[in-house]
Design a protein with these regions (language model features):
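Conserved beta-loop-beta element that borders a ligand/cofactor-binding pocket
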Residues: 51, 87-112
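Conserved C-terminal active-site "lid" loop/helix of NAD(P)H-dependent oxidoreductases
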Residues: 117-119, 151-154, 159-178
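NAD(P)H-binding glycine-rich loop region in Rossmannoid oxidoreductase-like domains
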Residues: 1-27
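Alpha-helical substrate-binding/gating segment
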Residues: 106-115, 129-151
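Glycine-rich NAD(P)-binding loop of the Rossmann-fold in SDR/ketoreductase-type enzymes
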Residues: 6, 23-34, 42, 73, ...
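Amphipathic terminal alpha-helices
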Residues: 183-191
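Catalytic helix-loop patch of NAD(P)-dependent Rossmann-fold dehydrogenases
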Residues: 26, 62-97
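Conserved Rossmann-fold NAD(P)-dependent oxidoreductase catalytic core, especially the SDR/UDP-sugar
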Residues: 34-74
Length: 191
């Protein structure tokens, strides 16, 4: 990582699994540790770390909407708990090591046809959909954000179909992110 100024860390197990001790914690906790330490040792200035809207799972259904980064977390399960850890340790690295850390609370980025069908069945999932192109725009904005950004939690989704579930004001302000797409834009590349 020598000479790297910004690192977008996307390596993780992205869902709950039957055996979290063996299949979730190693990539999402131990892998994160190794990534953060390598970045720190190499002098990486900006880390963009992927969290998830799943840290607010129950609030996603209960409201009031839109949720923002100040709403207390209500995780769905162990996957979301690993993302809560990521958010906390990211804050520690920003405070202790002077790194710029942006936490990306991502909407649903489907990875296969089954997930696309799940999203198609529920408007709430369509409202938190994040298209591949909007994800790219968001991450570019995070990497290019002002160097004085110390620690931020930003939500990222495409345009909602019905209800704005996540407030994107901070993402607009910090990462100049403005979603351009809406469900089902971009799903054709998943097949």
């Amino acid at each position: 990582l020598d000479g790297v100024e910004a690192l977008v860390h996307l390596a993780a197990t992205p869902d709950d699994v039957d055996d979290p001790v063996n299949n979730l914690f190693p990539p999402n906790i131990t892998g994160l540790y190794h990534t953060l330490e390598l970045a720190r040792e190499a002098g990486v200035q900006r880390l963009v770390l992927p969290s998830s809207g799943q840290v607010n799972w129950f609030r996603n259904f209960e409201g009031p909407w839109p949720l923002d980064e100040t709403v207390p977390v209500s995780p769905k399960g162990w996957y979301a708990a690993t993302k809560m850890f990521l958010e906390s340790i990211g804050h520690s690295y920003a405070a202790t090591h002077g790194m710029s850390v942006i936490i990306a609370r991502l909407g649903w980025c489907p990875r296969d046809e089954g997930q696309v069908r799940e999203i198609a069945d529920e408007t709430i999932y369509q409202d938190v959909y994040l298209s591949p192109a909007d994800a790219g725009r968001f991450f570019i904005g995070c990497v290019e954000a002002a160097p004085e950004v110390r620690y931020e939690i930003l939500y990222a989704t495409s345009k909602p179909v019905e209800t704005l579930r996540y407030r994107l004001d901070r993402a607009r302000e910090i990462a100049a992110f403005e979603p351009q797409e809406q469900w089902p834009d971009g799903t054709e590349i998943i097949f």
